[in-house]
């Protein structure tokens, strides 16, 4: 009977393996997983906290109060929100310069708004808003939840600048807002919508609500998926500790809703979520 020969791999001499291990250890980059906790502790320890609490956060509040007051005063002269958008963009530029976090925009960045357009954006941080105002180079309106109206200056600005308020607890009360959003889309004003309905509490993508896709289908608007990368680490919920770092805005290809009906809402939602997950899982750009 013929025997089947099995080849046993050659074993490296013990001293060679030890040399390989030592060489590999010497080549371990500073950002590797073994070095990351210590590196993070150095970068985002107490000096970082003190800078956030006593410099960055107070400066942001000063920008908010001063520019918010001017914007609210001028809102009585400009009812369509165009002037308020410019003030929001100025405020956002000051915030982004203050937090020392460079941003790179990648992907489909031609931003063709010649027809109705909805931008479906991930939401992990309060600083997502200034990032969008700085790096989306056009006028847009944001669909926001009614709870934000309780915040001084921020809520007042949202109410006076033509943004779209949705009451998630009482959808019937939002019928007027939905009609307003549809009118804005059909007139060519792009809408920015956070399909998760709010900030993620853990950095993971949350289930999508149907509202964004209902609006897009009714207006026959294209949907551009956008993933904001590393903003959860920058400033998660329930803290004022801003961890200055490089960020990325990844823009996906437009998803058409032409010829679809509201029965296709779930399918469109799944398609957009899949596109955003692909954007999030792409390798991080090194050239920030």
What are these regions, as identified by a protein language model?
Residues 2-43, 47-50, 175-288:
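Non-catalytic C-terminal accessory region of glycerolipid acyltransferases
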Residues 35, 39-40, 52-59, 88-144:
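Conserved H-X4-D acyltransferase segment
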Residues 39-104, 156-160:
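A transmembrane-helix-recognition feature enriched in membrane-embedded lipid enzymes
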Residues 92, 163-167, 197-198:
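Short, basic, glycine/proline-bearing loop/turn elements
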Residues 100-102, 139, 160, 188, ...:
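A generic structural signal for alpha->beta connector loops
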Residues 124-180:
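Membrane-embedded segments
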């Amino acid at each position: 009977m013929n025997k089947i020969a099995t080849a046993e791999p050659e074993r490296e001499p013990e001293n060679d393996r030890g040399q390989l291990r030592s060489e590999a250890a010497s080549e371990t980059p500073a950002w590797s997983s073994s070095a990351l906790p210590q590196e993070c502790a150095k970068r985002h320890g107490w000096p970082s906290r003190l800078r956030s609490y006593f410099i960055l956060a107070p400066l942001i509040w000063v920008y908010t109060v001063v520019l918010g007051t001017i914007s609210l005063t001028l809102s009585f002269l400009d009812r369509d929100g165009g002037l308020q958008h410019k003030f929001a963009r100025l405020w956002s530029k000051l915030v982004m310069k203050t937090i020392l976090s460079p941003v790179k925009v990648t992907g489909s960045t031609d931003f063709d708004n010649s027809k109705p357009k909805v931008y479906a954006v991930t939401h992990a941080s309060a600083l997502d808003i200034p990032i969008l105002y700085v790096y989306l180079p056009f006028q847009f309106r944001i669909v926001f939840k009614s709870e934000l109206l309780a915040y001084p200056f921020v809520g007042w600005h949202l109410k006076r600048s033509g943004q779209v308020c949705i009451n998630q607890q009482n959808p019937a009360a939002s019928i007027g807002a939905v009609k307003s959003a549809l009118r804005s889309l059909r007139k060519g004003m792009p809408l920015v919508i956070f399909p998760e309905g709010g900030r993620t509490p853990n950095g993971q993508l949350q289930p999508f609500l149907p509202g964004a896709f209902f609006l897009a289908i009714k207006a026959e608007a294209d949907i551009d998926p956008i993933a904001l990368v590393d903003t959860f680490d920058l400033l998660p919920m329930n803290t004022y500790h801003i961890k200055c770092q490089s960020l990325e805005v990844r823009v996906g290809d437009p998803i058409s809703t032409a010829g679809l009906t509201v029965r296709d809402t779930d399918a469109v939602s799944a398609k957009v979520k899949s596109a955003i997950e692909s954007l999030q899982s792409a390798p991080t750009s090194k050239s920030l």
